[in-house]
Regions:
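Divalent metal-binding pocket/active-site signature
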Residues: 2-3, 9-21, 33-43, 48, ...
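Short hydrophobic-acidic sequence motifs that mark active-site Asp/Glu residues
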Residues: 3-5, 61, 175
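Catalytic domains of carbohydrate-active enzymes, especially glycoside hydrolases
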Residues: 25-30
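Metal-cofactor-binding active-site regions of metalloenzymes
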Residues: 53-71
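Conserved small/polar residues in nucleotide/adenosyl-binding loops
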Residues: 196-200
Length: 200
């Protein structure tokens, strides 16, 4: 079975001690690709370095993570825009989306940032990788106007309901990423996976 890790932050400091071993175990387990999203401007260099070491196996993405959206978001977006303009290395825009789990202080800003990055995805013909935490309806509201466009991507680490999964799959070129949460006793994901006929 071929596996693709659509979202990994293995370039972060906490994984530095055994990073090579993690890659070896991933290969042995059948993982053929690892896609790495930065978080914000502070993690771009480390991400690109990791992807350079494992070129052809680890692939870089670029974007502004919703939990990094604050009053300074415009400067962060300028950096993302510059990276997209001057580098052809990036395989996707991500991870992007909305996260209202912690608080809703920057809800409006998160919507603005998401919409901007969705437009870049269309401009540069790149897929998006979406982070969604307690924010499905808000994200769907941003994405819905793009339903008839070539926009494509994946909701990584999807934990939504069967109804929400169905709404995602209304987009002709969107996928849902399922991770270990599906094994939790109280998880409703097995029902969601069954309902949408997803292949794990």
């Amino acid at each position: 079975m071929r596996l693709i890790d659509t979202h990994s932050h293995l370039f972060l400091e906490e994984f530095s001690e055994d990073f090579p071993q993690v890659i070896e175990r991933a290969r042995a387990a059948g993982v053929t690709h690892i896609f790495m999203p930065n978080i914000d401007s502070t993690t771009i260099e480390a991400m690109l370095s990791a992807c350079s070491v494992y070129k052809g196996y680890c692939f870089p993405m670029i974007g502004l993570h919703p939990t990094s959206v604050n009053a300074n978001y415009e400067k962060e977006l300028e950096i993302v825009a510059r990276e997209l303009k001057f580098s052809k290395e990036y395989v996707a825009i991500g991870e992007i989306g909305m996260d209202l789990y912690w608080d809703k202080t920057y809800l409006k800003e998160q919507q603005i940032v998401l919409d901007k990055q969705v437009n870049w995805a269309l401009e540069y013909d790149l897929p998006i990788v979406i982070h969604c935490r307690d924010a499905f309806d808000y994200i769907y509201k941003v994405l819905e106007p793009y339903k008839k466009t070539p926009l494509r991507g994946i909701f990584h680490s999807f934990t939504g309901t069967a109804e929400e999964a169905t709404r995602v799959l209304e987009f002709s070129d969107f996928f849902i990423g399922i991770n270990g949460v599906v094994t939790f006793k109280k998880s409703h994901l097995p029902e969601t996976v069954s309902y949408t006929h997803l292949t794990l």
